[in-house]
């Protein structure tokens, strides 16, 4: 046990030595893609890929917390994913129950706070209960915020937010002059979080699939070739090193 702890500490130190500690992205968002293809390559059912993907979430959460990432948003289930086979959807809906049952004690120990964005009221009762229990048990934690985007879609979020803004303006007798970027930001599901500096998508696909479409306007995109179950701590560090090698301009010019 002691040897294992020493090895873990050495690994974390090695990762920290590879990175510029002054330029760790505060908020990393990940599109966890490739579970189904991972299983298909191994002639396994798709649900096996989702199970292995859950193990990857644990690894990435640990390392993100250890290196000082403040926010980690994971695209767990989109508003479009309901069209998948019922058996697969049912399995995915049960994953948070199993995941949080086994991982919650460690999340509490590591001071990780569990949060969600998305239309979670539409989820099965058991899923909602597991999520709410994790939120309650970690509510006072002050470390990494682990944010699951579940039953989430960027367009659906914008429609929902626009309706709320319209109702607010109407009820308070305000006109549209009040609307600016800050006003919109304050009505999004992500209002309590900074925009992601880094967006990672695994599996090699190069699209954002309706994920945080407002929030990633100035994010750095990295499309990693690994399927999500194969994505590990080393791959995350590689992505962060690529991010650190770039110069973020926000539409301006770089300094010569």
Curated annotation (Swiss-Prot):
Its EC number is 2.5.1.-. GO terms for cellular component: cytosol. Substrate binds at residues 34-38, 46, 50, 78-80, 82, 84, 201, 207-209. GO terms for molecular function: ditrans,polycis-undecaprenyl-diphosphate synthase [(2E,6E)-farnesyl-diphosphate specific] activity; magnesium ion binding; manganese ion binding. It is an enzyme of class 2 (transferase). Its cofactor is Mg(2+). Binds 2 magnesium ions per subunit. GO terms for biological process: polyprenol biosynthetic process. CDD domains: Cis_IPPS. Gene3D superfamilies: Decaprenyl diphosphate synthase-like. Mg(2+) binds at residues 33, 220. Catalyzes the condensation of isopentenyl diphosphate (IPP) with allylic pyrophosphates generating different type of terpenoids. HAMAP family: ISPT (MF_01139). Homodimer. This is Isoprenyl transferase. The lineage of its organism: Bacteria, Bacillati, Bacillota, Bacilli, Bacillales. The gene is uppS.
């Amino acid at each position: 046990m002691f040897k294992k702890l020493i090895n873990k500490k050495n690994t974390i130190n090695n990762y920290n030595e590879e990175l510029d500690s002054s330029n760790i992205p505060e908020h990393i968002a990940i599109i966890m893609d490739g579970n189904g293809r991972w299983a298909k390559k191994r002639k396994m059912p798709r649900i096996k890929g989702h199970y292995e993907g859950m193990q990857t979430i644990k690894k990435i959460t640990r390392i993100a917390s250890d290196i000082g990432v403040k926010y980690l948003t994971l695209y767990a289930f989109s508003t479009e994913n309901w069209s998948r086979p019922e058996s697969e959807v049912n399995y995915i809906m049960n994953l948070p129950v199993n995941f949080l049952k086994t991982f919650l004690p460690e999340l509490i120990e590591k001071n990780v706070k569990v949060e969600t964005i998305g239309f979670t009221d539409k989820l099965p009762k058991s899923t909602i209960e597991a999520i709410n229990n994790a939120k309650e048990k970690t509510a006072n934690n002050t470390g990494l915020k682990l944010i699951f985007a579940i039953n989430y879609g960027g367009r659906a979020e914008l429609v929902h937010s626009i309706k709320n803004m319209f109702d607010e303006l109407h009820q308070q007798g305000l006109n549209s002059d009040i609307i600016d970027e800050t006003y919109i930001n304050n009505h999004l599901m992500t209002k309590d979080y900074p925009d992601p500096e880094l967006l990672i998508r695994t599996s090699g696909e190069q699209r954002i699939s309706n994920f945080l479409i407002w929030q990633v306007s100035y994010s750095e995109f990295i499309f990693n070739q690994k399927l999500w179950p194969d994505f590990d701590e080393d791959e995350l560090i590689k992505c962060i090193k690529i991010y650190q090698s770039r110069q973020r301009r926000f539409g301006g010019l770089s300094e010569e």
